[in-house]
From Swiss-Prot:
It holds the Pfam family Ribosomal_S17. It comes from Rhodospirillum rubrum (strain ATCC 11170 / ATH 1.1.1 / DSM 467 / LMG 4362 / NCIMB 8255 / S1). Belongs to the universal ribosomal protein uS17 family. It comes from the Bacteria. GO terms for molecular function: rRNA binding; structural constituent of ribosome. Keywords: Ribonucleoprotein, Ribosomal protein, RNA-binding, rRNA-binding. This is Small ribosomal subunit protein uS17.
Amino acid sequence: MPKRIMQGVVVSDKMDKTIVVQVERRFKHAVYKKFIKRTKKFAAHDELNQFKIGDLVRIRECAPISRRKTWEVVLDNAE
């Protein structure tokens, strides 16, 4: 099964080796046909503590690291 990959903005980096990423999704309302934005926050593993608030990052699913952390930061060559 492929792992999900999402893109979002870092909203918190206060924890050690953990960042909170806010992911925004857009969808069309079934009845009113208006586009709606919804956001969700994910705790992601940042091994090197290199990402700061406001950074645009990509995260992917992984095996559970702690109770709330099941995502890790994807390190691309572009970053």
